[in-house]
Amino acid sequence: MAEIICDGVHIHPSMVRAAFKMMGADRMILISDSMRATGMPDGQYTLGGLDVKVVGNHATLVSDGALAGSVTNLADCLRTVVKKMEIPLETAIACATINPAKSLGIEDTYGSIAPGKKANLSLIHI
């Protein structure tokens, strides 16, 4: 399995498409790598004792401008992977649900909606 941050900042869309092609969608897991400033307005925040500047969906270290993490939630990553990276919606949803459950060995209980499984539902607009 490969975990991939599809926020449009960490990895170029062409590289995401290439990773899906090389690995196969059943081995891809969408993650957000979101830091504590996720959902907050632009400004300066602290992450692990380091000063971080957030502008839009970019979080960079104040000290040297290096990428400091993501300020994008998983729903936004789903939108980005479908709209900008041209991954089919059904595939993207599997990469955020059943694939992580399989990676953790809990797919019999989580990761999809079926009788006997625990239902975790989110309603999002893509």
List where the protein language model places each region.
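His/Asp/Glu-enriched, well-ordered alpha-helical/loop segment
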Residues: 1-8, 15-117, 121
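Conserved small/polar residues in nucleotide/adenosyl-binding loops
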Residues: 124-126
